């Protein structure tokens, strides 16, 4: 059996279906039978187009001869390559030609199938001839009924979807309301009273004593229609604010020279710029902040009004409508107004005569807010906190008395506290005095070119005191003319001037007094500059005085003078400078150069001729030079003999 030729046995598959799956309960699932196209594709996959077309006998003989030859080979020559000899010489050529012919035939068949579409056409399925054709009317009725059923299904589905969307929107709005309420609670104080949610806008928790309740109510926003599109600025939460806290407000503080008509003052006219209402500005947080600001402004104005009535001053304060008028200095008035705009009334058109620049002092408004917060802090700190009830034994007076006990003066000074109005009036006085000082210095600097005046303001100031350093110099001679350096300390009602040598002069709030003082200092600067220039040029200072008692009397300060002599002593220059009279320069020549010098019979010695003669005035306006010091330098250089 083993030595005989191999016999090929053809086994066909049974017609039964193959089992695809057996379930747990014993049910068998069969593979569905293949269609004609699937069966054809399966059979085509079995064809091996590379296999030769020899007969089965030739193949069997070659296989048997190959096996016999393989057995006859020795085992040690297994690695060597063995070639089977051909049965006849043209056997290989025949096989190659046959394979080439087979491939060409297959290629021809494939091209024919691709080119001719009739080979790819399948036979139509035969229909039952007994089936009668349905009339077209019945077809239309059936289609209409089918479409109606489908439409009802679609409408029911759309209704369910819209209902689900509305429920989701309601749930989302409820969630948004809760989240907004949580956010509101994190920023504002809320409490539940019955079925209402109330909030507090007042500053009572910070120490405020203002009697306004400042209560607002939180409500749910139900004005929106769920069937329509929700706007972008929609907020599920809304707040109800008291009507007297609606709108915006601020405290206007201004200093005016002429008092306006008090009876024409109103609330709306003070609001020059009406803010346009934006949709985003109607959110609850912006409305609550604006309402709290209105409440704070009303508290500030109420405190100022109460103090204005209670304070006893030489010039009483006036409280009219929403305005408080005070006079810090003669001819000036301080106006503090409460400007409240609810946005309901339209702003009146301002007349041309009232179109003035905004004189609102924002610094004082900011200081008012700081002062009221300090007042709240003091009120809150004065509350007695919990403390131990036990104390050491002994009499209370003996326990409190001692070497560190307060006397009557200290106790009375502690009891004297300044109110909000007094502090803001003092700050207004200081601000006005500082601005007027700066204006005076700037006017002198722009009006007088020689000498030059410079002001260096300090950045570190107080609400009641400021300082400025004033330098008076001459252009081109800044290094040698540094004698006039003033430190002005601007207080509430006076100005303290500190000289370079430490002298202190106190000036009042009058503008003319400061201007006269600076003019006298500028006049003295010219004389000091001549003194410093004489030292540099080698001239000798014969006399110097800041206050000359001779000559015309100056209405502003006193005149100053100096006399210098040339290095050889032949020439002398006398300078007299006054704030009003101006500069006067005299030159004294030797007697030998005097034209009208005659011989005296009494003086026969020639040495007396070397004495200087009378003074001659110099036409100072005709001198060349850009400033006083430069002209004086040219004059000294002309009178100095060459070595």
From Swiss-Prot:
The keyword Transcription regulation applies. Residues 60-73 have a biased composition (Basic and acidic residues). GO terms for molecular function: transcription coregulator activity. Keywords: Activator, Nucleus, Transcription, Transcription regulation. Residues 53-82 are annotated as: Disordered. Its main location: nucleus. The keyword Transcription regulation applies. Belongs to the Mediator complex subunit 17 family. This is Mediator of RNA polymerase II transcription subunit 17. It comes from Danio rerio (Zebrafish). The lineage of its organism: Eukaryota, Metazoa, Chordata, Craniata, Vertebrata.
């Amino acid at each position: 059996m083993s030595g005989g030729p191999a016999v090929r046995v053809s086994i066909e598959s049974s017609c039964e279906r193959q089992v695809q799956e057996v379930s747990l309960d014993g049910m068998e699932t069969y593979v569905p039978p293949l269609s004609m196209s699937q069966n054809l594709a399966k059979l085509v996959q079995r064809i091996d187009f590379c296999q030769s077309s020899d007969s089965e006998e030739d193949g069997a003989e070659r296989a048997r001869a190959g096996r016999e030859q393989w057995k006859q080979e020795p085992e040690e020559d297994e690695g060597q390559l063995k070639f089977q000899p051909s049965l006849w010489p043209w056997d290989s050529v025949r096989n190659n030609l046959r394979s080439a012919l087979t491939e060409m035939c297959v290629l021809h068949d494939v091209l024919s199938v691709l080119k001719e579409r009739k080979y790819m056409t399948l036979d139509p399925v035969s229909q039952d001839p007994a089936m009668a054709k349905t009339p077209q009317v019945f077809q239309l009725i059936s289609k209409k009924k089918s479409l109606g059923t489908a439409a009802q299904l679609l409408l029911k589905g759309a209704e369910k979807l819209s209902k689900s969307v509305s429920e989701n929107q309601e749930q989302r709005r409820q969630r948004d309301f809760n989240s907004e309420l949580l956010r509101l609670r994190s920023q504002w104080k809320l409490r539940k009273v019955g079925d209402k949610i109330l909030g507090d806008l007042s500053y009572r928790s910070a120490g405020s004593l203002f009697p306004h309740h400042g209560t607002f109510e939180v409500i749910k926003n139900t004005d929106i229609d769920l069937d329509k599109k929700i706007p972008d600025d929609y907020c599920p939460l809304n707040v109800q604010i008291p009507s007297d806290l609606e709108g915006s407000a601020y405290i206007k503080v201004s200093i005016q020279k002429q008092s306006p008509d008090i009876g024409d003052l109103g609330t709306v006219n003070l609001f020059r710029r009406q803010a346009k209402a934006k949709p985003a500005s109607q959110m609850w947080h912006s409305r609550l902040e604006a309402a709290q600001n209105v409440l704070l402004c009303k508290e500030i104005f109420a405190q100022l009004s109460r103090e204005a009535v209670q304070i006893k001053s030489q010039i009483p304060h006036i409280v009219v409508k929403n305005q408080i008028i005070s006079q810090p200095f003669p001819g000036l008035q301080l106006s503090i107004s409460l400007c409240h705009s609810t946005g309901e009334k339209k702003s009146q058109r301002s007349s041309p005569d009232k179109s003035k620049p905004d004189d609102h002092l924002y610094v004082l408004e900011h200081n008012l807010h700081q002062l009221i917060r300090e007042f709240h802090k003091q009120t809150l700190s004065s509350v007695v906190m919990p403390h131990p009830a036990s104390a050491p034994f002994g009499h209370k007076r003996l326990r409190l008395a001692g070497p560190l006990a307060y006397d009557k003066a200290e106790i009375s000074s502690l009891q004297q506290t300044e109110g909000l109005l007094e502090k803001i009036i003092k700050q207004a006085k200081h601000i006005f005095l500082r601005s007027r000082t700066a204006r005076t210095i700037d006017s002198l600097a722009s009006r007088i070119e020689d000498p030059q005046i410079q002001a260096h303001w300090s950045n570190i100031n107080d609400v009641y005191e400021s300082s400025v350093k004033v330098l008076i110099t001459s252009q081109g001679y800044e290094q040698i003319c540094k004698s006039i350096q003033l430190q002005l300390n601007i207080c509430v009602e006076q100005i303290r001037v500190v000289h370079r040598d430490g002298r202190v002069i106190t000036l009042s709030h009058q503008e003319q007094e400061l201007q006269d003082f600076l003019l006298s200092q500028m006049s003295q600067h010219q004389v000091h500059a001549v003194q410093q220039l004489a030292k540099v040029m080698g001239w000798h200072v014969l006399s110097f005085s800041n206050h000359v008692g001779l000559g015309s009397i100056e209405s502003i300060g006193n005149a100053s003078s100096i006399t210098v002599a040339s290095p050889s002593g032949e020439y002398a220059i006398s300078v007299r400078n006054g704030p009003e009279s101006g500069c006067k320069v005299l030159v004294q020549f030797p007697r030998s150069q005097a034209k009208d010098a005659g011989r005296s019979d009494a003086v026969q010695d020639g040495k007396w001729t070397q004495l200087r003669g009378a003074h001659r005035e110099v036409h100072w306006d005709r001198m060349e030079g850009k400033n006083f010091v430069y002209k004086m330098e040219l004059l000294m250089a002309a009178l100095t003999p060459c070595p």
